[in-house]
Regions:
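N-terminal Rossmann-like FAD-binding beta1-loop-alpha1 element of flavoenzymes
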Residues: 26-54
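Glycine-rich FAD pyrophosphate-binding loop
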Residues: 45-70
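Hydrophobic anchor at the start of a short beta-strand
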Residues: 28, 51-52, 385, 513-516
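Mid-domain catalytic core of redox enzymes
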Residues: 47, 327-328, 351-506, 534-535, ...
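Conserved flavin/dinucleotide-binding core of flavoenzymes
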Residues: 4, 8-14, 67, 137, ...
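Active-site/ligand-binding neighborhood in enzyme catalytic cores
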Residues: 190, 201-206, 210-361, 366, ...
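Conserved Rossmann-like nucleotide-cofactor binding loop
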Residues: 36, 60, 392
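Dinucleotide-binding Rossmann-like beta1-alpha1 core, especially the glycine-rich loop
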Residues: 71-233, 285, 289
Length: 600
């Protein structure tokens, strides 16, 4: 049993033997056990004498990066590809889950365009005998390091299909991994393939200049796309006030209307001309039609452009990446491993404890009051406070005086909620040309006659997510508000609805479905509309509390990837070690100009 699970069963506090914890030791109360909260906890234990106490409202570790288990199968919420331009994040991951030289897809030759980074991976050797009393699966692999090249972007793709570019240092780095490998605690190297499903046809994602694309679009539409793009380059919309302006400037009006407008509005439930252009800066950044065409030409005509051992990382937009790292049993495996380490090193993790009140004395937070599933209340005092809870809830929980304008901004923040329906099938109706399973990790469904937004094929993320390799395990993704009829629909009705939709567009035959499972995830995506244009009023107020640090996606109301969320936590710990936390630098993560623009 994972160590943190013991806390779910009722253990209130866990103090590791030999850690020397005392009643005088400083404490950090961390609200939330997602990537940001868990990173903060482990960093504090590794680098300071501060004891982390994590309070998680749910019964699961990992936040939206958790892995759902259902009858031996596993589901990844939204899909989490492990890359990072941050050397620090990459090393952090590698220390915990080194690449598996034995696993399926562990190809040492990983090619992208741009600069490369080398990662030391243990050489292949025979397994040592299992340790006595640990069972047949406890054998460890021990080996000296071997060098392979691996991409190190990070992408936690959002529902829009776009992804972040995060550049935290430009130096080529050799990442070291431990010499002892648990055969299950590893990263696989997986091929990435994503496509758009539109007009009941598959298009490359991102759109590429290929014969298939031209055939699918038809001559007339292709000409309109080209002319429209040229017009957009000649006459740019300035200033870019909305997401619509942002997309037209980069893709042209015709391509925007064909591939972006209806799908984006399906995802967000809001017209593109009412969504802040900052959303595009966060999620699309360096990608444009020009970028996609250049990438295609390099792959097609430049020697070594495809199949080379070079790794495309800091010079390639993450939407163009072709291989990625992935924990053997899904992203939640890594975060559960981190939770075990936190508890083992003397930290505490309290599951199903929701923070409802934050006690303040002036501009200093002194304690939080939380309630568990049985209604029991407890006060947790601390010296430092990390919050990953939604900012709307944070402001409501503060017992300090809150200005009316700040309450107004917080109350007006909006979130998009998420539903995924897992379907276990005998087969898919659509297949590769050779009759094999589609190789896509996910498919963006842009058909306007269904609500379905995206489809994952979990088999292609990791074969270990599927209990029966002869079956196909897919996830149908829906984006809604918690006030929508779709969100309120009973599970069985929602299963029938989802099956009917994916059958309607020709992906499966309804009779091939063996089983289904529904997962609802509230406040998955912080929105860039509502009162967001006044967000600075809110952030200035929360920053005024000297020992309160907002980190993570919902904690900062920023559409961050998991590596950016981790970096916010690391930056706070850096500041605590240095004696001063620069809160402005926290808001700068994933928003610097370098992230927003293509490199010239």
């Amino acid at each position: 049993m994972p160590a943190y699970k013991s806390l779910i069963l009722g253990l209130r506090q866990y103090v590791a033997q030999g850690t020397g914890l005392t009643s005088m030791q400083k404490r950090a109360i961390i609200i939330g056990a997602g990537p940001a909260g868990l990173t903060a906890g482990l960093e504090l234990l590794r680098r300071t004498g501060i004891q982390p106490i994590l309070l998680e409202a749910s019964a699961e570790i990992g936040g939206i990066s958790r892995t759902i288990r259902y009858k031996g199968n596993r589901m990844d919420i939204g899909g989490h590809r492990f890359f990072s331009k941050s050397d620090r994040v990459m090393q952090w991951w590698m220390d915990l889950l080194p690449p598996d030289p034995y696993g399926e897809g562990s190809d040492p030759d990983i090619s992208y365009q741009g600069q490369s980074r080398k990662v030391r991976v243990p050489a292949r050797v025979e397994e040592e005998p299992p340790l006595r009393g640990m069972g047949p699966k406890s054998g460890l692999r021990r080996a000296a390091g071997a060098v392979i090249e691996i991409d190190t972007h990070t992408e936690e793709s959002g529902p829009d299909g776009e992804s972040n570019i995060a550049a935290h240092g430009e130096t080529e780095t050799i990442v070291e991994v431990p010499p002892v490998i648990d055969p299950d605690l590893v990263m696989l190297i997986r091929p990435r393939k994503s496509r758009i499903y539109y007009l009941r046809k598959f298009f490359d994602y991102p759109i590429k200049l290929t014969g298939t694309t031209l055939t699918n679009l038809g001559v007339t539409r292709t000409v309109r796309v080209g002319v429209s793009y040229i017009q957009s380059r000649i006459t740019q919309i300035a200033p870019e006030k909305s997401l619509e302006d942002f997309l037209i400037n980069r893709f042209g009006r015709e391509l925007y209307l064909t591939f972006f407008k209806s799908y984006t509005e399906k995802v967000w439930g809001t017209p593109c001309d009412q969504i802040s252009a900052e959303w595009g800066a966060q999620r699309i950044k360096g990608l444009s039609l020009t970028t996609a065409v250049k990438h295609f030409l390099r792959k097609t005509f430049v020697r070594g452009g495809e199949g080379s051992g070079d790794v495309a990382q800091k010079g390639t937009d993450t939407s163009l990446i072709e291989r990625f790292m992935y924990p053997k049993f899904g992203p939640g495996q890594l975060w559960e491993h981190v939770a075990d380490k936190i508890v083992g090193m003397g930290g505490e993790i309290h599951m199903q404890w929701k923070v409802e009140r934050i006690e303040c004395r002036g501009k200093t937070v002194v304690a939080v009051e939380a309630v568990n599933a049985s209604g029991e209340r407890q006060t947790f005092e601390g010296d430092y406070f990390f919050s990953t809870m939604p900012m709307r809830e944070l402001v409501t929980a503060l017992d300090a005086p809150v200005p009316a304008n700040v309450r107004e901004v917080a109350a007006g923040l909006q979130y998009r909620d998420f539903i995924t329906v897992g379907l276990l099938c005998d087969r898919l109706k659509v297949q590769e040309a050779d009759g094999s399973l589609l190789k896509d990790t996910w498919i963006y469904v842009q058909e306007p006659d269904v609500l379905l937004g995206r489809l994952q094929i979990f088999n292609n993320w990791s074969p270990h997510l599927v209990s029966d390799p002869g079956k196909v395990w897919i996830g149908l993704e829906y984006f809604c508000y918690d006030t929508d009829d779709l969100w309120k629909m009973e599970d069985e009705a929602l299963k029938r609805f989802a099956i009917a939709e994916v059958a309607k567009i020709g992906i499966i035959d309804a009779e091939s479905v063996i089983d289904a499972h529904v997962v609802r995830v509230p406040k998955t995506y912080p929105a860039y509309f509502g009162t967001y244009e006044r967000f600075d009023e809110l952030s200035a107020f929360t920053d005024s509390f000297e020992n309160l640090f907002l980190v993570g996606r919902n904690g900062m109301h920023k559409y961050n990837n998991q590596d950016h969320s981790m970096l916010t936590a690391m930056t706070v710990v850096d500041g605590l070690c240095a004696g001063h936390v620069d809160k402005a630098s926290l808001w700068g993560i994933n928003t610097e100009q370098e992230y927003h623009e293509e490199k010239k």
